[in-house]
Swiss-Prot record:
CDD domains: aeEF2_snRNP_like_IV (cd01681), EF2_II (cd16268), EF2_snRNP_III (cd16261), Elongation_Factor_C (cd01514). This is Elongation factor 2. The keyword Cytoplasm applies. It is found in: Cytoplasm. The lineage of its organism: Archaea, Methanobacteriati, Methanobacteriota, Stenosarchaea group, Methanomicrobia. The keyword GTP-binding applies.
Length: 730
């Protein structure tokens, strides 16, 4: 206990010196060794015993993680490392590598300033490596590289010393190619990873050794020595001469920025307020005595303390008892406890200053992405943009009717803890629907509801989430209010895909200055008049007001947008969410008396015009796709390609490496259920495969009617398809 107390004292002292802080994440493709690396870094810093490191999986503290052998949540820990005789505080987040839990990676990247990208020396960069690197660069998080499992190259693939260096060079080149393509400016500004400069380390997390060019100079151990030690199976000597934690954490401290440096570049990317305001300056310079600006990146539940909000403190200091505002709510809350994480344990401290990652209780209105501040009306941080979208849904029911009220509360809670999960109540069927990133994601959540929340549930078979869209433009359609006193003339048309992409990337929002948004839309090819009239953005859909001088329209526009949003949440064809639609209001006639243009009149009028318009514009469906990457011995390649093509898959690329074939394909999510078992049979169990989100595409016309019919039947809608006249005659 003495050692632990001493560690806490060192951590709390260093917290107050931002130059000595490094906030870092460890990111990688699944099974490339992130959690084993994290544990050995903790052992090196004296947090857990060296004997248990790598086998204890301290960071995988959840039962589900240990049972499945994968990281599901992002875990936080603070530790101390000595570099050049100076102590440094390292706040470390270990993130999941499985594509279904990518939301945790995205959120963790908002909290950190640097990332250790882990790549398996044998497998090289994989789809999820690319995804996590993109997430890091998008949040302006600087990467360094750790090439793991070098011992496997030598002992399993039997490569010689020269071939080993060539292969390692290829991994570095590929990572740099990704950085250059994703962020050319940062690449030019010195963010490329370079072994000679010291921003790359090589080693084995399992056997606790690592080498880098600075480490070679320090220890005199060369690449040839590494090769000989591995060949002889003498990992112990290698770990004594070149300890993993020393090589990796020295690299982190030397090359990844402290909060003072990082926030100068990052604040303008993640916050669009006035940089010259007091809070703007305070965030840019990480002032501990400025106004509080804290961004919540994670919500978890402590059985004793209730909800714990973890996040990054950009400005000010957090102390127990202080009163704060949470974005999206007008009332204040009182901070109850402030603390830091040491793996699964949360340790209370008196005060946490800017530049740190903090855990807070008492913020009952906070959700992931909330801005917590002492300023009333502060511009909130930009929302966290997730790379993937929920593509699979299950219906959830309580096994025992008496548990229904508890289930509703539990679903609200899990949605708060995991914002990549979407919970909706299907009002027609009374079912609770849970949409997630994939089958595994939903399985884990369902298991947690039963295990942690003590509610027995039954779930339906997984169902694919579709999107409604349109194929052509319509003339303006008249929507009348039930009392016939108000009329709206709205046309609908497909929204340009470049604009859709910019909305998804967060480059076009309703929060940004109007002139900036207008300019961006004009650059992307939108007509100047339309770009001027943006009234609302909902998911990847836009509502434009092109009217001139209509009396009372300003007072009713909010209700018009409510009607627009209702349709965008559930389209007329299948009640699925709508994507990539532009609605343009070209004219309106409104009753002069406000009593005749209330919500019950205006919302149905705008809603019906859009619903009818979509049906006239060839309403269709988009289905989600996954990119599938399969590694298989060349002799068994035929079985793998046949399996993919039999699922409506398109082979995008095929390459060979040694006796392995690497197949890249794009397959509809609807066809991927049961793939794991089938691909094993087709390849005698020798295929390794992974997936990533592959966007949405139009459902082929040959199966559209069948799929629409299945969705309508499942939702209890009429068998006959709706017609535009059904909405216009209302």
């Amino acid at each position: 206990m003495g050692r632990r107390k001493k560690m806490v004292e060192r951590v709390t002292t260093l917290m107050n010196d931002p130059q000595r802080i490094r906030n870092i994440g460890i990111v990688a493709h699944i099974d490339h060794g992130k959690t084993t690396l994290s544990d050995n870094l903790l052992a090196g810093a004296g947090m857990i015993s060296k004997e248990l490191a790598g086998r204890q999986l301290f960071m995988d503290s959840d039962e589900e993680e240990q049972a499945r052998g994968i990281t599901i949540d992002a875990s936080n820990v603070s530790m101390v490392h000595t570099f050049d005789n100076e102590d440094y505080l390292i706040n470390l987040i270990d993130t999941p590598g499985h594509v279904d839990f990518g939301g945790d990676v995205t959120r963790a990247m908002r909290a950190v300033d640097g990332a250790v990208v882990v790549v398996d020396a044998v497998e090289g960069t994989m789809p999820q490596t690319e995804t996590v690197l993109r997430q890091a660069l998008r949040e302006h998080v600087r990467p360094v590289l750790f090439v793991n499992k070098v011992d496997r190259l030598i002992n399993e693939l039997q490569v010689d010393s020269q071939e080993m260096q060539v292969r390692l060079g290829k991994v570095i080149d590929h990572v740099n190619k990704l950085i250059k393509n994703m962020n050319p400016e940062k690449f030019k500004a010195g963010w490329k990873v370079d072994a000679a400069a010291g921003t790359v380390a090589f080693g084995s997390a399992l056997y606790n050794w690592a080498i880098s060019v600075p480490m070679m100079k320090k220890t005199g151990v060369s690449f040839n020595d590494v090769y000989e030690y591995c060949k002889a199976g003498d990992m112990k000597t290698l770990a004594e001469k070149c300890p993993l934690h020393e090589a990796v954490l020295d690299m982190v401290i030397h090359f990844l920025p402290n909060p003072l440096v990082a926030q100068q570049g990052r604040v303008k990317v993640i916050w669009h307020g006035d940089e010259n305001s007091e809070v703007g300056k305070s965030m840019t310079h990480a002032h501990a005595d400025g106004d509080l600006a804290f961004m919540v990146t994670d919500i978890s539940v402590d059985p004793h303390a209730g909800e714990v909000a973890t996040g990054r403190l950009f400005s000010g200091s957090l102390t127990r008892g202080m009163e704060v505002y949470t974005s999206g709510t007008a009332k204040k809350s009182r901070v109850q406890q402030v603390g830091i994480f040491m793996g699964p344990e949360r340790l209370e401290v008196d005060k946490i200053p800017a530049g740190n990652i903090a855990a807070v209780t008492g913020l009952k209105d906070a959700i992931v992405g909330s801005t917590v501040t002492t300023l009333d009306g502060m511009t909130p941080f930009e929302s966290i943009r997730h790379v993937s979208e929920p593509v699979v849904t299950v219906a959830v029911e309580a096994k025992h009717t008496k548990d229904l009220p508890k289930l509703i509360e539990v679903l609200r809670q899990v949605a708060k803890e995991d914002p990549t999960l979407q919970i909706t109540l299907d009002e027609e069927t009374g079912e609770h629907l849970m949409a997630g990133m994939g089958e595994l994601h939903l399985e884990v959540i369902a298991h947690r509801i039963e295990r942690d929340k003590n509610v027995e549930i039954t779930t339906s078979k997984p169902i694919v989430v579709y999107r409604e869209t349109i194929k052509k433009k319509t003339e303006p359609i008249e929507g009348k209010s039930p009392n016939r006193h108000n009329r709206f003339y709205i046309s609908v048309e497909p929204l340009d895909l470049e604009i859709v992409s910019a909305i998804k990337e967060g480059e076009i929002t309703m929060n940004m200055p109007e002139l900036e948004r207008r300019q961006k839309l004009i650059e992307l090819g939108m007509d100047k008049e339309q770009a001027k009239g943006i009234a609302g953005i909902f998911n990847s859909n836009i509502f434009i007001d092109q009217t001139k001088g209509i009396q009372y329209l300003n007072e009713t526009m909010e209700l018009v947008l409510d009607g627009f949003e209702e349709v965008m949440r559930a389209g007329p064809l299948t009640r699925e969410p709508v994507a990539n639609v532009k609605c343009v209001l070209v004219d309106a006639k409104l009753h002069e008396d406000a009593i005749h243009r209330g919500p019950a009149q205006i919302i149905p009028a705008s809603r019906q015009a859009i619903q009818a318009g979509m049906l006239m514009a060839e309403d269709s469906l988009l289905e989600p796709y996954q990119k599938v990457f399969v590694q298989v011995p060349q002799l068994l390649m035929g079985g793998a390609t046949k399996e993919l093509q039999g699922r409506r898959g398109v082979i995008l690329n095929m390459t060979t490496e040694g006796d392995l074939a690497i197949i890249e394909a794009r397959v509809p999510v609807a066809e991927m259920f049961g793939f794991a078992g089938e691909i094993r049979s087709a390849t005698e169990g020798r295929a390794m495969w992974s997936t990533e989100f592959g966007g949405f595409d139009v459902v082929p016309s040959s199966i559209l009617t069948e799929i629409v019919g299945q969705i309508r039947e499942r939702k209890g809608l009429k068998k006959d398809l709706p017609k535009a006249s059904d909405y216009l005659s209302m």
